[in-house]
A protein has these predicted regions:
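C-terminal "cap" of GNAT-fold acetyltransferases
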Residues: 12, 116-163
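Acetyl-CoA-dependent GNAT
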Residues: 4-92, 100-109, 113, 140-146, ...
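Residues that form or flank phosphate/diphosphate-binding pockets in enzymes
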Residues: 79, 97, 128
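Active-site acidic-Proline motif in GNAT/NAT acetyltransferases
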Residues: 90-96, 124-125
Length: 163
């Protein structure tokens, strides 16, 4: 974890985070244009309406390059829960603790904001991510066949109750 910094938004973050998602999920899960454009548009929309009193956004920087990210969308935090999104760590630093640090930042942020819960959507087969979610106390509460990422997968909803 030497030379790795956890930061917020930096110029180029939207493009790089989109690239990380598109290349990882494209090569491992055959996700394509629909997924990449969804990440780009939804991340852009989130950052345009970003409110630091409500939302969290963290990047992992190494050598001046974005190598990971995680966001907390707090727009529906009091009703639906805080939405954990765009969690990814590049192959270059995967397994070095950056994902753990991002999760610590996000969960700590939500606790300080006294949000009732954090939720996320993922899909079956992402074992390292699931392990990390469960390490932080998230529990799977739903599983359904779906195509929200442009390809049929077994979507899973995880929730961490905070109060």
């Amino acid at each position: 974890m030497t030379n790795i910094v956890i930061a917020g938004y930096v110029p180029g973050a939207i493009g790089r985070i989109t690239e990380l998602h598109a290349t990882y999920y494209g090569s491992h899960w055959d996700f394509g244009l629909f997924f990449e454009s969804k990440v780009a548009s939804e991340l852009s929309e989130f950052l345009r309406r970003f409110d630091p009193e409500r939302d969290g956004f963290w990047t992992v920087i190494r050598g001046g390059c974005v190598e990971g990210s995680l966001a907390i969308d707090g727009a529906q935090a009091e009703t639906e829960g805080a939405h954990l999104r765009w969690f990814i760590v590049s192959d270059a630093i995967r397994g070095q603790g950056a994902g753990n640090r991002l999760m610590e930042e996000a969960v700590g942020f939500c606790r300080r904001k006294e949000y009732p819960r954090i939720f996320l959507w993922t899909f079956k087969g992402l074992h390292p991510a699931r392990h990390l979610y469960e390490k932080f106390g998230f529990r799977q509460v739903d599983q359904v066949e779906g195509e929200q990422w442009g390809k049929q997968v077994l979507e899973q909803r995880f929730v961490l109750a905070l109060r």
